[in-house]
Amino acid sequence: MSSGRALLHNPGDLQKTASTAGETRSSLARLPIPTRLKVFFVGDNRSTVNWGRGASLALGQLLSFSFEITGRVSGDFFVLATAEAGYVGTLVSPKYYSVFRHLLNRGRRLFAWYIKLEHFLGAKDFIAEDPAESIDNLLAHKHRHPALARIYNQAKEADLMVLDGDGDIIFSSPPRRQTLFLLAMIELGIRLKKPVFLVNSMISDCPLTGRNNRTLAAAKRLLAQCRTVSLRDPESLEYVQKEMPETNSSFIPDSLFAWFSLYENGNSRPPLNGDFLLPHPEKDEYWGKLDFSQPYICIGGGALAGSQPERAVEAYGRLVDAISSLGYRVYLTENDSSDSFLQRVAREKGLGVVPVTAPILMCGSVLAHARLFISGRYHPSIFASLGGTPCIFLASHAHKMGSLSRVLEYDLHRQFNAFPDASEIAEIVSTARQYLEQGETLRVRIRQVAKLRSYESAELPDFLKRHMNG
């Protein structure tokens, strides 16, 4: 691929709602207004063991420039295994719900009889397939569950609700609890007559199980009643415009792009000695493996790869061997807890690994200053792009990686297989070599696109205010 074909300068397939660079203030330069509307922020994923937590932090910062965040629901609520309140109608008092949640763990077969008894006596997850039923459950049980009462009260006291859709709205069978939780929160906002905004979202059918028409029907009903829905990628926008034409939808890039200014100069480089970024507990096998004084390539995981760790270890082992032939140091980046298979690859190949729990700004720094990043992870690929690092995209669930290549204006929108075989690995190496040969010319172009996306993402607060009155 020639340098002139590496990126498209003026793609016609992105519908932009934000202002141009010259019309937009830096996100960090925004000043709070004297009286600010109160926001209930649903989907704050900062506590999630995933590098995508940076996007939630960036979104919270964007909202805080213009609004007062008076309530939050963390991403922990989306999953039963971590939710502060999930099952209702249990024999166990809500005061001891953490004990019940502990017993729910599928690995605790000794207590399976007790969970079956609870089900028989009427215990259930308050999140149902029908969002209306979910909120009926919340209202019926909030007097016994302080966590549910807190959700209701925070929503009631807010002036508007902002939901971070992230990559959680996929119409799979069975339905994802994350999807159902978000739809339930929209239902709650509508019942309370609050302006509801779904932002930062991907929306798609499930490529593995096909479309869940029941969940799609619920989403169509609820999203049409949101003030507006902002999608983070063009394919999600096209999907909503086709399947939910009554929904007021727009494209606004992911909030993580708003962190561009943090990585646009040399002060953002990782420490030359990578031991300085190791998180607690500083495991012995991590020490002495990361040297950022020399050019390096990073390889990350992916949701699809993480779902089949044995297969992933084999495929990534071959990929590492092939990429090492390019003459650069190779480091693995554990971008999510399900990327733990990379720890085994690192041990077998003697490679350094950046742990999932490393400080998030340092995680971004490692990727932003790599020579190349190969991954099936959405937000880590954005981190890389903030510094101009070219990306090679591996497949993941739904369309997110291929669509990200459109957001970043790549000419090549290809997603390679999550478990690349020998022929695909050869193509990956060939593409990598072409990107590396283009050097700083390509990196400048990528940074220019990321900078434009940062201006657009920083317009989100003004976008919300414009739609407050319908």
Give the residues covered by each predicted segment.
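Active-site anion-handling motifs in enzyme catalytic cores
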Residues: S2-G470
